[in-house]
Amino acid sequence: MSQHYRTLLSIGIPIMIGQMGMIVLSFADTMMVGHHSTTELGAASFVNNIINLAIITGTGFSYGLTPVVGALFGRGEQAEAGQALRCSLLTNTLAAVAMMTVLLVLYFNLGNLGQPVELLGYMRPYYMVLFASLPFVMLFNAFKQFTDSITLTRTSMWILLSGNLLNILGNYIFIYGKMGAPEMGVVGAGVSTLLSRIIMVVIFIVVFMRSRRFAAYREGFFKLGWSRPLLRRLNSLGTPIALEMGMETASFSLSIIMVGWLGTIALASHQVMTTISQFTFMVYYGLGAAVALRTSYFHGQRDVQNVRHTVTAGLHLMVMLEVVLGGTIFLLRNHIGAWFTDSTEVSSTVLTLLLPFFIYQFGDGMQINYANALRGIADVKPLMLIAFIAFFVISLPVGYLCGFVLGYGLMGVWMAFPFGLTSAGVMMWWRFRRYK
């Protein structure tokens, strides 16, 4: 098992660092917007939850490339892996168009979702700027899943970190109106995000086209052309993963509508804790991605024993991460709210959300580990049903029950998350047990 621990960490740590870079960026966005205006923080909270639903759903779709390239890499078929990247760029672009159509419909109905009227003027322009960045997110995801699947995880790590540094600099310039730029507030945060996402895609294209380590993959990318069976396989693998991750995120994003009924302070507090929650989620997902990569590698070699050992090692490491991250956040609990806003009311409300946050950490890590194990072995169709039961049949009704029927307010809405995530983890573990 020790070899599996080392391998998972060597692959997973660069992914975790890249993911943490994304969350540091989210921290920076939230802190810089929050200190500019609590009202803008509330608007950003609502818009980010909707746009992040599309981004995470799209990211899930791009994960369909992982078992394909991972298995090809395990068999040494580099040209075919390059062809798979080409096909993934097409399917990801088409997925972006589909999601943007839905987002456009939502944009024209923002005023009908029961949100505070004073926030709509901030929501609409910020929404459209982030809307424009979605195609670049999907193109980046295709390149990232490809390089991660051939174990070059440091490539995406460095590109992500570079893009995030540019984004933070852009936030400073556009939110506060520095270096001759107009003071744009929350819209400036969106402009900075859009520019950084475009730049990251350009960097990835240059690296893929110029680096010698991708030479064999470039040959397949340009010479093997389009493959209809491969396009269908990417769709058949990516769609269930997209729906599973989308339903999980939707349980959070739809909760934001209920939170909006509680007012601006509740929305701002929810955004602060969502940012903290995203940090732990992304770290767990970095390790989960390593589990998916290693299971797809061994699955391509028909090595059942090492698939199982990899998944068990992943669960052990996941529990260690939960203890370390949960303990750190507990020690810093009295300072978290002040990092993001000057409002003492928001800071005190944030403290009430820490209990459900700590409770659901194990369930979150468990479902991430086994979801990625199932993706690695390409057993993805059951994920849709599991996600529907866990997040729509269990989580959302429990959130409404605790938050409004029983009268626990924002904390009640958050109490639903432990129920949904833990039930998802148990069902995914049960499904993986059948692997032979």
Predicted regions and their residues:
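Small-residue hotspots at the loop-to-helix junctions and early N-terminal turns
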Residues: 38-49, 123, 127, 190, ...
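Short runs within selected transmembrane alpha-helices of multi-pass transporters and secretion channels
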Residues: 62, 130-148, 156-164, 189-205, ...
